[in-house]
Amino acid sequence: MNIAVVGLSHRTAPVEVREKLSISDEHIEKSFCSLNATEQVLEVSILSTCNRLEIYALVKNQELGVSAIKEFLIDHSGLSKEDLFPHLFTFNQAEAVNHLMRVSGGLDSLVLGEGQILSQVKKMVRLGQDYKSIGPILNRLLTQAVSTGKKVRSDTNLGTGAVSISSAAVELAQLKLGQSLGKDQLMTLQSEKVAVIGAGRMSRLLIQHLQSKGCSKLTLLNRTLNRAESLAKDFPDLDVKCGLLDDLDKCIEFSTLIFTSTASNTPIINSELLSGFKRNNNLLRLIDIGVPRNIASDVSGLPGFEAYDVDDLQEVVARNQDARQQIAIEAQNLIDEEARVFLEWWASLEAVPTINRLRSNLESIRKEELQKALSRMGPDFSARERKVVEALSKGIINKILHTPVTNLRAPQPSSQRKESLKIVESLFELGVSENDQ
């Protein structure tokens, strides 16, 4: 058995590729069913965010298992092997474990140390459990990754002052406003006519950051009015005008800054829609943090409009990254230790079949000898006395097993453990059962 991760991220693929791999909530069950039906995949879970899609799996055979996951990604994305494979990464065993710990700790994020990824890793654990696709190995790995992510944020300063995708989007708007005025600085958004499209978690974070950057009023559009109004109620100090997506035309006409963050699988804004608007000197900035993208690529270059997507956030991220690199080194040291702990536990499982056979053999001997002893005691031996003798025999077996079992499972080089297992199997004449093969 081998642990593997196959996926892509903002580091390996542009948004136009990532959006084709994104798995929406409505398609997640089908994806789990497909992966669970794969013969080579023993356990599996899926991490799908705006910046990455990663499949974590316990596979029978490394090469065949990874190949099966790649075939799933081809089918899901509709991309050819030639278009997809250059953007994929594959990590195995220790590298896969370390990568997951880095992801959970925020070290592999577009925004170093951002906290939302930890919630997404928690969701990955929950999905794996809900669809009964993770067993003891991945469950242990994923839950330890969550605890590692928490530890990184509590034991280092990586999470302090970290920006998120949403806050980076707001900073990008401030930066572009400043640059349009000939200033390389973040400007207040107080005078901007702002609109947010979508009323999900990312939109909530957007509104929080917009309010903190000087925005006092905005328009909030969503497919359902109730959800938009419910979100608006959480910001009593902000003047929020709610509406439906049917009002998008009017919103485009009167806004100077629009953020999009919907779950739509197709763009809601494209060049055909915008071509009917004459902006004159009134520039409209469109910042899209949706994946798949909410704003079509053909919008770029239209007069009167500037469009940005999640890949454009790099400009803002770079301004904050340098000062955080030393903290990231501290976090990586912690991650290395957590990965080592898991890998030691994983390696110790090599001894489990031998330990189980040894315990089974000794248990058979215990029962046989106990039965002989009890039969010699005669009918006058009470039920209570029988229980005492049986407990005594079990205690002796457990005492005998404790030290060798502890030593067999202790951290040690694989070659040394294999040699110890051979010796135990030879001394106790432990055959290999079908369950161990």
UniProtKB/Swiss-Prot annotation:
- Biological or metabolic pathway of the protein: Porphyrin-containing compound metabolism; protoporphyrin-IX biosynthesis; 5-aminolevulinate from L-glutamyl-tRNA(Glu): step 1/2; Porphyrin-containing compound metabolism; chlorophyll biosynthesis
Cite the active-site annotation. C50 (nucleophile)
Q: What is its EC number?
A: 1.2.1.70
**Amino-acid positions noted as binding NADP(+) in the UniProt annotation, renumbered to this chain:** G198, A199, G200, R201, M202, S203
**UniProt source species:** Prochlorococcus marinus (strain SARG / CCMP1375 / SS120)
This protein's name: Glutamyl-tRNA reductase
Q: Read off the Pfam families from this record.
A: GlutR_dimer, GlutR_N, Shikimate_DH
Q: Which CDD domains match?
A: NAD_bind_Glutamyl_tRNA_reduct (cd05213)
The answer, when asked if NADP is one of the entry's keywords, is yes
Gene name? hemA
Quote the catalytic activity from the record: (S)-4-amino-5-oxopentanoate + tRNA(Glu) + NADP(+) = L-glutamyl-tRNA(Glu) + NADPH + H(+)
Feature type site, description Important for activity = H99
The protein's GO terms of the molecular function aspect are: glutamyl-tRNA reductase activity; NADP binding
Family the entry assigns: Belongs to the glutamyl-tRNA reductase family.
Binding, substrate: T49, C50, N51, R52, S109, E114, G115, Q116, Q120
* Record PANTHER family: GLUTAMYL-TRNA REDUCTASE 1, CHLOROPLASTIC
Known partners and oligomeric status: Homodimer.
Question: What is the documented function of this protein?
Answer: Catalyzes the NADPH-dependent reduction of glutamyl-tRNA(Glu) to glutamate 1-semialdehyde (GSA).
Miscellaneous field: During catalysis, the active site Cys acts as a nucleophile attacking the alpha-carbonyl group of tRNA-bound glutamate with the formation of a thioester intermediate between enzyme and glutamate, and the concomitant release of tRNA(Glu). The thioester intermediate is finally reduced by direct hydride transfer from NADPH, to form the product GSA.
* Comment on protein domains: Possesses an unusual extended V-shaped dimeric structure with each monomer consisting of three distinct domains arranged along a curved 'spinal' alpha-helix. The N-terminal catalytic domain specifically recognizes the glutamate moiety of the substrate. The second domain is the NADPH-binding domain, and the third C-terminal domain is responsible for dimerization.
User: Keywords of this protein's UniProt record, alphabetized?
Assistant: Chlorophyll biosynthesis, NADP, Oxidoreductase, Porphyrin biosynthesis
Q: Name one GO biological process term.
A: chlorophyll biosynthetic process
Q: What class of enzyme is it?
A: oxidoreductase
